């Protein structure tokens, strides 16, 4: 074997060994939780993000708040849904909520992330006006990135224009 082939093969082997030891940037750590860590609370584990904020919760407890196209205003027919969440949180001081804003696929990614944020802030403001402690409320906008309903129809778009309540134990 000539010297150039040997050097090339050796260099390739060393590079492969070095790269195989690198961590996947999407894994978030050796636990594979993508930047999420856990805190034990009794028998439950509260998943938190890199900022220590809750990253998950129970989404099945309350109805979603739906929004009109290109709107972040809470419509009067949706207020009773927010009031139900406020009543629950005001009566359960050990609970908190993550408000998750979703949009349909129309519009740019940046616009939809901002619209999802405006939607959750509208819901947040209403919850606070009903006496919910702002420290019990976290917000997250998915924009169009995490559709609740797949499809390219008016029905699918309508279902994706919403705020989801994810309840967690503090």
Residue ranges and their predicted role:
Residues 23-96, 170:
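Periplasmic peptidoglycan-binding/tethering modules of Gram-negative envelope proteins
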Residues 151-156:
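Short proline/glycine-enriched turn/loop segments at secondary-structure junctions
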Residues 134-138, 160:
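Short acidic capping loops at alpha-helix termini that bridge into adjacent secondary structure
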Residues 17-21:
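C-terminal motif of bacterial Sec signal peptides marking the signal peptidase cleavage site
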Residues 63-64, 82-119, 137-149:
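Short, surface-exposed beta-strand segments enriched in small/polar/acidic residues
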């Amino acid at each position: 074997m000539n010297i150039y082939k040997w050097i090339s093969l050796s260099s390739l082997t060393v590079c492969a060994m070095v790269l195989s030891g690198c961590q996947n940037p999407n894994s978030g750590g050796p636990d594979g939780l993508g930047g999420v860590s856990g805190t034990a609370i009794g028998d439950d584990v509260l998943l938190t993000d890199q900022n220590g904020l809750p990253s998950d919760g129970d989404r099945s407890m309350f109805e979603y708040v739906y929004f009109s196209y290109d709107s972040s205003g809470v419509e009067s027919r949706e207020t009773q849904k927010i009031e139900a969440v406020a009543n629950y949180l005001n009566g359960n001081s050990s609970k908190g909520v993550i408000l998750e804003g979703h949009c349909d696929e129309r519009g740019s990614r940046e616009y939809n992330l901002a619209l999802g944020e405006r939607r959750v802030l509208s819901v947040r403001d209403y919850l606070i006006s009903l006496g919910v402690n702002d420290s019990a409320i976290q917000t997250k906008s998915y924009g169009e990135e995490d559709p609740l309903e797949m499809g390219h129809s008016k029905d699918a778009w309508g279902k994706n224009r919403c705020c989801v309540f994810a309840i967690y134990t503090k």
